[in-house]
């Protein structure tokens, strides 16, 4: 199954510029690189269309997509939906070698409404940025309400390993059909093996609108543009600092930066 699907899976590398502020108010800019995965869902107007997570590509200065043959090409964002954590990026076929075009393939979509717990599941993606990897497991639960930083999402839960870099990759059934888009892994000292994916039936109408460059929601999710660390009472005591949230980074051009 995985061998047949590999031509549909890509790696996505983004370059990001962030600004951070020291305790003394000094602002510094730095460039970082992030990696994720994507799934080839079609071709339109000479462009290869790829779905991934919004958090993989949001605010990227530039994007590069790596294909199954190891070749890569620059990509641009076609549309994003931060509420659904989905994005469609495109690669101009003019920037791709003919040999690569012959080796890639469009993924086959499944029907996530027919899933049952205990069913086999396969996760494919660019785990840890090391290239394509395959992990197997089962559908652990359906319609899980998962609380993320700024939203609640209804997701598929699986014990197939979803590691950093797998975001935007494929969750497949035993037929090799796309049933979900890997998005997050729950990790703690007490819990292992809890990965989550956006059901493909939830994603399809949103993806179609993104391809057409149509608005996907009436209003965007409120967005501040900072990353921080929660300082709980034990950390506050250890480091002799107040409890609360310590702002570590302010994203360039975000509402937080514009507000000063």
Could you tell me what each predicted segment is?
Residues 1-235, 242-243, 252:
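Serine-dependent protease modules
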Residues 239-241, 260:
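A structural signal for short secondary-structure junctions
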Residues 50, 256-260:
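Conserved PDZ fold ligand-binding element
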């Amino acid at each position: 199954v995985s061998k047949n699907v590999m031509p549909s899976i890509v790696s996505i590398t983004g370059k990001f510029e962030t600004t951070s502020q020291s305790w003394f108010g000094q602002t510094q800019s730095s460039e970082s690189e992030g990696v994720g995965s994507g799934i080839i869902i079609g071709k339109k107007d000479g462009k290869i269309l790829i779905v991934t997570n919004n958090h993989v590509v949001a605010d990227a200065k530039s994007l590069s997509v790596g294909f199954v043959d190891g070749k890569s090409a620059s990509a641009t964002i076609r549309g994003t939906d931060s509420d659904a954590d989905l994005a469609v990026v495109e690669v101009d076929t003019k920037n791709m070698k003919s040999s690569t075009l012959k080796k890639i393939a469009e993924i086959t979509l499944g029907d996530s409404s027919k899933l049952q717990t205990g069913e086999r599941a396969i996760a494919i993606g660019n785990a840890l940025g090391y290239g394509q990897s395959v992990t197997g497991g089962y559908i652990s639960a359906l319609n899980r309400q998962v609380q993320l930083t700024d939203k609640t999402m209804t997701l598929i839960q699986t014990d197939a390993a979803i590691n950093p870099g797998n975001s935007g990759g494929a969750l497949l059934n035993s037929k090799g059909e796309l049933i979900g888009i890997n998005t997050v892994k729950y990790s703690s000292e007490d819990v292992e093996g809890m990965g989550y994916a956006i059901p493909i039936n939830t994603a399809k109408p949103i993806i179609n609108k993104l391809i057409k460059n149509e608005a996907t929601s009436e209003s965007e999710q409120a967005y501040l543009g900072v990353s921080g660390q929660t300082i709980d009472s034990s950390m506050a005591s250890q480091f002799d600092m107040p409890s609360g949230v310590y702002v570590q980074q302010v994203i360039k051009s975000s509402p937080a930066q514009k507000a000063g």
